[in-house]
Amino acid sequence: MYAAVEHGPVLCSDSNILCLSWKGRVPKSEKEKPVCRRRYYEEGWLATGNGRGVVGVTFTSSHCRRDRSTPQRINFNLRGHNSEVVLVRWNEPYQKLATCDADGGIFVWIQYEGRWSVELVNDRGAQVSDFTWSHDGTQALISYRDGFVLVGSVSGQRHWSSEINLESQITCGIWTPDDQQVLFGTADGQVIVMDCHGRMLAHVLLHESDGVLGMSWNYPIFLVEDSSESDTDSDDYAPPQDGPAAYPIPVQNIKPLLTVSFTSGDISLMNNYDDLSPTVIRSGLKEVVAQWCTQGDLLAVAGMERQTQLGELPNGPLLKSAMVKFYNVRGEHIFTLDTLVQRPIISICWGHRDSRLLMASGPALYVVRVEHRVSSLQLLCQQAIASTLREDKDVSKLTLPPRLCSYLSTAFIPTIKPPIPDPNNMRDFVSYPSAGNERLHCTMKRTEDDPEVGGPCYTLYLEYLGGLVPILKGRRISKLRPEFVIMDPRTDSKPDEIYGNSLISTVIDSCNCSDSSDIELSDDWAAKKSPKISRASKSPKLPRISIEARKSPKLPRAAQELSRSPRLPLRKPSVGSPSLTRREFPFEDITQHNYLAQVTSNIWGTKFKIVGLAAFLPTNLGAVIYKTSLLHLQPRQMTIYLPEVRKISMDYINLPVFNPNVFSEDEDDLPVTGASGVPENSPPCTVNIPIAPIHSSAQAMSPTQSIGLVQSLLANQNVQLDVLTNQTTAVGTAEHAGDSATQYPVSNRYSNPGQVIFGSVEMGRIIQNPPPLSLPPPPQGPMQLSTVGHGDRDHEHLQKSAKALRPTPQLAAEGDAVVFSAPQEVQVTKINPPPPYPGTIPAAPTTAAPPPPLPPPQPPVDVCLKKGDFSLYPTSVHYQTPLGYERITTFDSSGNVEEVCRPRTRMLCSQNTYTLPGPGSSATLRLTATEKKVPQPCSSATLNRLTVPRYSIPTGDPPPYPEIASQLAQGRGAAQRSDNSLIHATLRRNNREATLKMAQLADSPRAPLQPLAKSKGGPGGVVTQLPARPPPALYTCSQCSGTGPSSQPGASLAHTASASPLASQSSYSLLSPPDSARDRTDYVNSAFTEDEALSQHCQLEKPLRHPPLPEAAVTLKRPPPYQWDPMLGEDVWVPQERTAQTSGPNPLKLSSLMLSQGQHLDVSRLPFISPKSPASPTATFQTGYGMGVPYPGSYNNPPLPGVQAPCSPKDALSPTQFAQQEPAVVLQPLYPPSLSYCTLPPMYPGSSTCSSLQLPPVALHPWSSYSACPPMQNPQGTLPPKPHLVVEKPLVSPPPADLQSHLGTEVMVETADNFQEVLSLTESPVPQRTEKFGKKNRKRLDSRAEEGSVQAITEGKVKKEARTLSDFNSLISSPHLGREKKKVKSQKDQLKSKKLNKTNEFQDSSESEPELFISGDELMNQSQGSRKGWKSKRSPRAAGELEEAKCRRASEKEDGRLGSQGFVYVMANKQPLWNEATQVYQLDFGGRVTQESAKNFQIELEGRQVMQFGRIDGSAYILDFQYPFSAVQAFAVALANVTQRLK
């Protein structure tokens, strides 16, 4: 045979484990019974009793397979005993568990519907020496030390009892194999025999000097007569039908042996109690514990060595270790297992068909793997290698065949799952939600205030093996407010030792096992009021179990001990925040590492923010809002906003700069941060996230508030802009800043706040006035200069950034290629929040937004970034990890700047990945820096501007909507990506629609799509990548319309799209210099959001400054929206041939975006059209890049048309075509269509998609050429209907003809919004698809803008929407708006979009899109008119609810995809039921909660409970939670709840 202790961390409880008992799994139904019994014993349950009076029931498995599913709950801590549990005994036939404590209390537990409850209670006040079930499980033998013995039935009826008068105590009692007699052992070496009816049969003296420690038979513990041992049982050991159930083995062939162990360590093997010549085993061990395996052929004897005394002088303690010896039925020694255990082994038991031997020593539990046969060489090698490796992860380093590696890894698969999967990395365990349905059952205990520590401390323990494993510690840091810091519970021990072997010694030595911190948790005490106790009313001793009795004096001591427990370290490094600095922490070096999160509150304790302090955690971990009745007579209403926390690469982790002091006191709307709250460049993280913005779902919140709330929640995504940009951001930012200034001097020039967000922002105004290109030209001049001047420089920057970000040879080679990082766009979106209040938008990143718009001139060659190039583009390098987190700046309801971090999504990746290879590319990047600069000043101006007419969004939120839209787009992260991909796919699917949409976007914005055409000029490198995020900016379109229906809203819009995303970044200066592209992109979005006109202006300006328009191929960061196609479920939407095309960058072709001076090409907004069909792609593309900034007329708008039909997917890709066509397209800058652009914000596809996508040349027809476009002037009514029609029906047909014939003609399809997207409907089908796609896209991205503007347009059909659209707000593409508008649009369109959505897994853009990220976009939408759409779909009761629905949807469908980075779950507590009898509100906690309290609550998500909290003692609570809660988040919510001024 062979035996070895299992590898892996030592399993520990918080107190000494005193007894063990194991049982196999029970078949769940009759159908399972015929299955081989062996399977039943691969899984089982281990019962443990400990010194804290808690019984642990823990799941075990021996199959060594990780793929096997485990029960949702693998550990139960059963409380109820008043003193240490000394005996646990399973009754396998009846599936009951008997437990006895030191005071004589006996509980019989039974499990029903997943919960354990006490069935029987017996307490006669005397110590129980033994409790044994008969072999058939029908009777129980109870023996007391005072000589009283009792036999009762399994149901609790007493059969007989007797008082045995002895001078010594009874130490043990057992049944004979036939259950006809009972034997008792005494402390004076005697054996007393009685029959099953209580008649005395004999007294036998076995040993004169040694007392009997224990007795047992080498016979199965239970005999179960069931059909499980049927002929179908293939088990080798299958016993006869009446064989032992536990381990069916032909035991009957072996004559039963009575085994008696004595205090001396000797063991006698007897045929019967009267055997005169027993076989004596002299083990040489002290404190012996012996047990036969169930098969009856192997006796395990565990004890401490005696011979160690020889070496005791020098190092006796080291030699003194426990060992296990194995003997056969003849008493022959077979094997000795030496262990490193240096404490006595208190209890052992066999399990899993004798393949495991479980040993308890102190608080530690050891699992020994036993091989009964001669061990194979393979097994010996496995154990030798495993003991050398020590860790499972090292197996992969060996050069072994896969089968051997797999076999070797089984040595590391634990029989009992450890509480923390990786003891060396507990941070991950507490920071991220558990996978699947795994639920963590914890206990939270308050420890007394300690002067050293400061305020009261709470420790969160994970229930395990009947004990508590500390995983988090919280300390109150303010006497005025319920504010806490959450930290690691570690003390001086090394992190890896916390739960390792050192834990045992520390717990044992420091806590002496009896005072470990848990017990005070009052696990024992909690049960004091347990119903089981009350049921024991018939027991005379019941009062002893009363609560008073349970309040043992140990409690305070234990509490103190707890605070000293090595596992509850006292050291608390200071985080550096003023509130924390007052405390002194000895371990300054660990300071940053020890604080994980902070819970901040308003003065009233009704709103809480959970802020991540650790570098690896998102800054925003959630928020809790309480709403109570005036008199506190009704249960409180809790609303929890919980951002999903996903693990991200450390590369993208940024230390969040969170100001815990920033908390809006009572004002819900007042964020603490001011306009400057959004740092210009580097300090993106400094922005505070006000708590006030968060509102309970039950409360009405302004759109702004909603947005702020969502965004702040999104903050959970962590991080900072810098994260997004990474190092490159810093550099790029700096460089860009310089460039920006240069590039966007106009911004400064147009100091006019609304006007100049980006140097060209003024453009909007200009455009408004002069729809013609003329306006654009002026900015163009400066812009061009910028472009030109920066063209090289930017080019360099971009190149640099491209190289840095996406080390792609292509980019480097292209040198000029501008790399617009989608991520920046995303960040921009953050900034965009400014929405509602113009002033509010402090430095809204709007100014930053512009960069993307103009991709500086890039060589026409670049324009066509081929798929390959695009792939290059995906500067995923920057944040290739998608991400870590991106910091989003938003404005809360009061207009304060709020910064939130959200995990970057792949989308992000794609965004920043897009780099324009063109030489002029850098120009775009340049923009970024400028954007940053300009944005701030302009931001607010822009905001004002936007707020005014620009965004006619229904609510005052419009400004934010754009931001939000961009944010949403990015916040949507995956969702947005989905959107984009959706759009993409949609386009693919419905090339027509997509084309239309693209065209619309392109057209609306101005045929900027011409950008591609622009490539004609050599710099046509228009093929800039449109920022994926920029699409969100599209909503700025509304701003354009806001400028005036007739004014060139288009231009503004266009800029908006692109700028919006960038803006937010600029605000934060997210872009690292290397990531200049990125910077520009984000900034652009933001800025655009803030001021579309400005943004556009900026963008246009830049191109103007740079090379001539034609030359300046705007390197729009073409959102890699299409990239997501593959990544997002949405791809599904257009999984048709179109889908493939979608991936083509055709839509992206827009890159050359010619932005008229006035028109900012908002790449972000441009919907990407996948190159579905050649012709349509072009159109699609256009829509995709609705920006079509009217570059000086030269931008190849016209060419696009030409190109469009032909290249559609691929030609569009080739910027050259567009470039060639550059002439006509000149998008008439002021043309409202530019707005249209905005309306169609493209989603950001995954970087891969992006790269594959090319910017399809948008048919940038001279705006004049579009009759449809002009209608855009009044997008609200006219255009919308027209586009509607086009999109909806003719979408393909009429426009197709138009577009197709025109190719230049852009049919403005205001699919989702009233963006007049110029769709080259070269391919009538394409347009339709485009439209659908665009719709969807818009829905998401544009919904905000669309809600307003699109609404209006659709309102063309729907008047109400028209109201918002009046300003071309429709162009603002806010996802919600878009959705609403879409809905309004026409049922037909709606149906289409729905179908599309289905394809994409989105039911309805607005509803199906699970914008889990609830980027401000959704919130905004919700707050705004889009809220109607949202509500109409889900009729959420409040914005919070809307978010919730969104989150829910996303979570449901994303499967972690959409929600992976930034979904915000909105949950509420379950309303308790009123109990008339007791006059209290009650909840069903499944027996886990033993005291009624107003603080008890349960949280539900989608109808299933995901968290529950309840009191079990005066200072102890239970806390159970599962996904989406991480331990840190759940603990923070519990701390917030505990401080409520309620009973």
From Swiss-Prot:
The primary gene name is TULP4
**Residue(s) carrying Phosphoserine:** S577, S1343, S1374
Domain remark in the UniProt entry:
The SOCS box domain mediates the interaction with the Elongin BC complex, an adapter module in different E3 ubiquitin ligase complexes.
The subcellular location is: Cytoplasm
Major localization class:
cytoplasm
Residues covered by the SOCS box domain: 364-414
Entry protein name? Tubby-related protein 4
Please indicate if the UniProt record lists Nucleotidyltransferase as a keyword.
no
Its cellular-component GO annotations read:
cytoplasm; cytosol
